[in-house]
Amino acid sequence: MWNNFFVFILLLMSAVSCVNVPENGTIAAYSVSEDTVSVSIRGNVPVSGEWDAEWIHRYAADVDKLAERAAADSREEIDVLFFGSSSIRLWRGLEEMMAPLSVVNRGYGGATVRDILVNYDKLMAQYRPKAFVVFCDNDICGNQVDLSVSGVLDHYRLLFDRLDQDYPGVPVFFLSWKYSGLRAFMRDKQRLVNSIMADYASGSEQVTFVDVNSTLLLLDGDINPELFESDDLHINHDGYLLWTSMLKPHLMRVCER
């Protein structure tokens, strides 16, 4: 009965054993078969859910293109790997804005933290960055497969733990979820996600919360429409310049530039 479904399973234990658990009991990768996905991780992170296989792989072609692009890139050591959803993918001029840092853009449109976890190996490829930047705010956008606010935190904890296992000591910069006119009806949940993620980061040596959303707001707390594209969802060049002004000093510091 589980055909065409991907199942995310996490047992609540101090050291969890699902599939592909290393002998030392630390986090293991997602294990993907024809109709299941399982997770193994150490720690206390309860996560469960079911998603249609077609949905979880809806951007497989885009992810494959990123993998092909990485295969053609001879670099391994870079300064910063950016990944996440369309707000990363559409960051035109990222290399110039972040210069002299060497950066790689691994964003793809519509990404959620769930399919980032599934596509993790393809997204990270061969790169060994000094820092990660992630922006991905599609797990709560008003559709039937939305996560709860607590579910967003749980899945990001999975992602952060996997990064810490594979890239020990490498900092992760989490960009706050941005408000937009198109998703104004989601603002209370977006605000709560930002509050929870900021609180999480405050107790983490790995994760830094960067409140880029604040750069897009007017004094009354509403969004500045002059910083958005006509779709009322994505930011424009001026918006990215503001994000850069807030984020780049952090990256220059950790990359020792």
Range-by-range predicted roles:
Residues 73-76, 97-98, 125-127, 166, ...:
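Extracellular/periplasmic catalytic domains that process cell-envelope and extracellular macromolecules
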Residues 1-80, 96-99, 254-256:
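N-terminal secretory targeting modules
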Residues 82, 103-105, 209:
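Conserved beta-strand scaffold positions in the cores of enzyme catalytic domains, especially
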Residues 88-104, 115-153, 173, 177-181:
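Oxyanion-hole/transition-state-stabilizing segment in secreted/luminal serine hydrolases
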Residues 179-257:
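Catalytic His-Asp segment of secreted/periplasmic serine-dependent ester chemistry enzymes
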Residues 72, 78-93, 111:
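Catalytic nucleophile-elbow at a beta strand-turn-alpha helix junction centered on a G-D-S/GDSL motif
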Residues 167-171:
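A short helix->loop->beta-strand "cap" motif at the edges of active sites that frequently abuts
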